[in-house]
Regions:
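Juxtamembrane interface helices immediately C-terminal to a transmembrane segment
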Residues: 42-43, 54
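Structured non-transmembrane domains adjacent to transmembrane bundles in polytopic membrane proteins
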Residues: 48-67, 78-169, 442-625, 632, ...
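Short hinge/gating elements
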Residues: 38-42, 450-451
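Membrane-embedded transmembrane helical bundles of large multi-pass transporters/channels
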Residues: 1-38, 135-447, 557-826, 840, ...
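Asparagine/serine/threonine-enriched low-complexity, disordered tracts
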Residues: 830-831, 835-836, 850
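Intrinsically disordered, compositionally biased tail regions
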Residues: 847-894
Length: 894
């Protein structure tokens, strides 16, 4: 299917780019430009909780509690505020503020009107004015921004009196501004840095622009898609940053994989035509990109099981962005490849040798067309034929396959997995133990809600809010509330007496207003946020009189019940994403063992990542260096980072193991397939991880703690996943499993084959080296008869030892029809029965005097990648060697 799409893209290469760009621009102009007006600040709480019900009852009866929307603090620099000559000017300023903004301000309660003692600090230096805004929900933030300029000007109007702005709405506005700056920072700093990295990796200006085109279109298109979603469901403002982060990073990664595979196909076999290269690149890398995006989308869709609208909006937006990135990669890029052809390597840039890790990645990815031409010239110089130099066996084994001018067997991405396989047991134990050790800090994790501590310590709004909480603890903007319904005076007294015994409060509960329609609201402050859970639990234990209902409400209760809802749904989310990814990977790999291995390794990496995040953001390691205040984590953000990490980990697993499956489809041994996959994708995965880390790094300097949390979580996960897990742990574990890696029941292989995978029915059969047991479809060893050795021929006179060029028919290409027919002729001429014990891999090798031994593959039961070498001197098989190594020996004899 994907190959046919590549053919379609080639045939319509001039139309597809124009259509795609036109659709993206139209989407942005029609919807994307209105996104800021459609975003919401709400959606953090569980809509089905008692605290949400309490808030709804209070708002319906008394109106929204808007007293803490905006707080203006006035502090006298010398003396008391009453003695300040600016006292009257402040009173006049507040009166004019209310008169100038009747549509935004409901009322103002201040010390400067009636000089209420509760509205001034104990030292008499600081007094405040509470500004209640008229709007509800998202309109509240718009009302605040309408008066924001006039509030900021107050600091310059009263000499000798400092003015600060605090309050819940002011904090929300500061958080929103910080997220907008994060997006601008990512676009301003991350994109140029990514462009430079792509230029180093590809060595070509044109090739480096391809992923950037996909990334840019993905950002623009995702804004339009988010705006469309906001018309149907609530989309939190935080979703914008997450969608930009994921959409940009994955779009560039997918573009990197597509460009790398197209250049590889373009230079395969001495150079293919552009049409074939586009078709094969789309049929291989394009298919992998789509399935990889499906893995990420499945992981993110697990967020939909939670009741919070914030998580749902992030899931919708992120899934849309990831899907758009994949669609652009398999539509826009194949068409551009078709237009460019070999010009994709135009404007080559000389890469210095001191470029470090990126240089290693670049050399592993090859030098494109230039390297391919150099390889062709070298082959012609040695007198090799084109068909011989680029045989299927050579392409199936990293020992001889070459991407550009550097053989894969000489790259770091071949040597490191090879070393890990040689020390498989020790590597597995060390890495698993280390990852489990890093996960230990998870036991110290703490959860909380969003507040001013998510802002930088130097932020003016955060400083003002801290001052207000310190000077006026009984007026905290997040009080705990009791909403009592259907209670008479005696019953209300019973509830009040029980509430007065609760510990951890700043004072006794007081009614916010007179009882109305049988509903009374009591309010009190909590001494410390760390006591929220204890206070809520004590209030839940209140036994109301018969017929009376007591709801525990307020911000602390909303946070506690939101956390409880998350942990109630977390097992369901985990079961769903694990099961869904197992099914998808089984269809991609044609195996059940590989998906199970991938899930276990992903969970190990996730545990280590969350452990490091807890160590950093809860325990405070690096807090001064990165400019944040350690404290409880916001539970929805923790669930979000878990889904993102799981999706990214399975994303890279698909890219890595897909190349191993390709080698296995060509009947390569297990160890050879492992080296083939890691050697071909190690550099690409590392380059993709570096690029993703650069994008995340731009968000790592965010002013918002929760964006830092997500960014550092992705950075840690990428470092673990692209290095020790994919390059060391995966090869080691797969080497230990050997042919059991490929086991699956017949129906799984049939389903994988229906999706275009060439999964052979005997792929589970023993074809590899080492200690693995060969298994067929049913899981039982599949036995094949081995023919008797041919009787020795008559002795021939010894010829001088000199190289003799073998006839063309003596060295057939692996799996060729000629070799099968010649072997069948030899087998039919033998009269002896084949009753010896079967072996996993067999060849018929005949000594022919002074000519090199002739080797013929046995059809269907023989792996072309590995053979036993027959020694004419001892008359028995010696060690197993790769088929391509035998070809290299023959080449040296020529």
């Amino acid at each position: 299917m994907f190959s046919r799409w590549g053919e379609f893209a080639y045939q319509h290469r001039r139309v597809i780019p124009l259509v795609v760009v036109a659709v993206i621009i139209l989407l942005y102009l029609t919807f994307g430009m209105r996104l800021s007006d459609r975003m919401s600040q709400e959606g953090w709480d569980d809509p089905n909780s008692d605290s949400t019900t309490a808030a709804a009852i209070e708002a319906r009866t008394f109106g929204r509690d808007n007293n803490g929307d905006v707080i203006l603090l006035f502090t006298a620099e010398t003396g008391t505020i009453d003695e300040s000559p600016e006292f009257g000017h402040i009173q006049e300023y507040l009166t004019n503020l209310l008169a100038n903004h009747p549509d935004q301000i409901d009322h103002i309660t201040s010390y400067f009107d009636k000089r209420v003692d509760r509205l001034i600090s104990q030292d008499k230096r600081t007094a405040f004015a509470a500004i209640a805004l008229k709007g509800d929900g998202d309109q509240t933030l718009k009302d605040f921004r309408a008066i924001k300029v006039q509030l900021a000007g107050a600091s310059r109007m009263f000499p000798g009196v400092s003015t600060q702005v605090a309050g819940a709405t002011a904090v929300a506005d500061a958080l929103d501004e910080g997220m907008s700056q994060d997006i601008s920072r990512a676009e301003f700093y991350a994109l140029p840095a990514v462009a430079l990295l792509l230029l180093v990796v590809f060595g070509s200006l044109v090739a480096a622009c391809m992923p950037l085109i996909v990334g840019g279109l993905s950002i623009v298109g995702s804004l339009g898609m988010l705006s469309i979603l906001a018309g149907f469901t609530q989309v939190n403002v935080f979703a914008h940053s997450v969608v930009t982060l994921l959409g940009l990073g994955l779009a560039i990664d997918y573009g990197l994989f597509m460009v790398s595979r197209f250049r590889e196909e373009l230079n395969r076999g001495g150079g293919q035509d552009v049409r074939t290269a586009v078709r094969r690149a789309t049929g291989t890398a394009g298919k992998t990109v789509v399935f990889s995006a499906a893995m990420v989308a499945v992981a993110l869709s697990g967020l939909l099981v939670f009741p919070q609208a914030f998580l749902k909006s992030v899931a919708y937006g992120a899934i849309s962005a990831v899907g758009l990135a994949a669609v652009l990669s398999v539509t826009m890029l194949p068409a551009l490849f078709s237009l460019l052809g070999h010009n994709i390597d135009k404007f080559m840039v000389r890469r210095p040798r001191w470029v470090g890790v990126t240089g290693v990645v670049a050399r592993a990815l090859g030098r494109g067309r230039q390297g391919g031409q150099a390889g062709q010239r070298s082959a012609r110089g040695r007198g090799r034929s084109r068909s011989y130099s680029h045989s299927r066996a050579a392409a199936a084994t990293p020992a001889t396959a070459s991407k550009g001018s550097k053989k894969l067997s000489e790259t770091w991405w071949y040597r490191l997995p090879n070393w890990s396989m040689q020390h498989a047991v020790w590597v597995t134990c060390a890495i698993v133990g280390g990852l489990m050790l890093l996960a230990l800090p998870i036991g110290d994790v703490e959860f909380g809600g969003i507040n001013e501590t998510y802002l930088p310590p130097t932020n003016q709004v955060r400083t003002a809010q801290s001052t207000f909480d310190r000077e006026f603890p009984e007026f905290r903007t997040e009080p705990i509330k009791l909403v009592v319904t259907n209670a008479d005076n005696d019953q209300l007294i019973q509830v009040y007496q029980q509430a007065a015994q609760v510990e951890g409060l700043t004072g006794r509960f007081t009614p916010t207003s007179a009882t109305k329609d049988g509903i009374t609201v009591l309010s009190a402050g909590i001494v410390d946020r760390a006591h929220n859970q204890s206070v809520v639990d004590q209030l839940r234990a209140i036994e109301p009189p018969p017929g009376v209902k007591v709801y525990v409400g307020g911000t602390p209760a909303l946070e506690i019940e939101s956390i409880e809802a998350l942990f109630d749904k977390l097992p369901l989310m985990s079961f769903y994403i694990v099961l869904a990814t197992l099914v998808l990977m089984a269809l991609v790999f044609g195996s059940l063992v590989l998906p199970a291995k991938a899930v276990i390794m992903t969970l190990l990496g996730m545990g280590a990542t969350i452990g490091l995040l807890t160590w950093m953001f809860v325990d405070g390691v690096g807090a001064n260096l990165f400019g944040f205040t350690p404290g409880p984590l916001m539970s929805p953000v923790l669930v979000l980072i878990m889904a993102i990490i799981y999706g990214l980990s399975t994303d890279y697993e698909v890219f890595l193991v897909s190349r191993m499956v390709e080698a296995r489809e060509r009947r390569a041994a297990t160890d050879v397939a492992i080296k083939f996959g890691t050697a071909h994708t190690g550099g690409i995965i590392s380059a993709a991880a570096i690029i993703m880390i650069v994008v995340c790094g731009a968000f790592g300097f965010s002013d918002i703690v929760m964006m830092k949390y997500i960014a550092f979580g992705m950075i840690f996960a990428l470092l673990f996943d692209a290095t020790i897990i994919r390059m060391m742990l995966v090869p080691a574990v797969m080497h230990l499993l050997q042919d059991d890696n490929w086991w699956a029941p017949p129906w799984v292989k049939s389903a994988a084959g229906a999706l275009g995978h060439r999964v052979s029915r005997n792929q589970g059969q023993g074809q590899g080296q080492g200690r693995g047991r060969g298994r067929g479809q049913s899981g039982r060893p599949k036995r094949a008869p081995r023919p008797q050795p041919q009787p020795p021929r008559a002795a021939q006179p010894r010829q001088p030892a000199r190289p003799v060029r073998r006839p063309r028919t003596n060295i057939p290409e692996p799996d060729s029809r000629a070799s099968v027919r010649m072997e069948q002729d030899r087998a039919s001429s033998s009269k002896q029965p084949s009753n010896q014990h079967p072996r996993r891999e067999e060849t018929i090798e005949l000594a022919t005097g002074n000519l090199p031994p002739q080797r013929f593959n046995k059809p269907r039961t023989t792996s072309p990648s590995t053979h036993r070498h027959f020694s004419p001197t001892t008359g028995r098989n010696t060690k197993q060697v790769p088929f391509t190594e035998l070809l290299k020996r023959l080449e040296s004899e020529d």
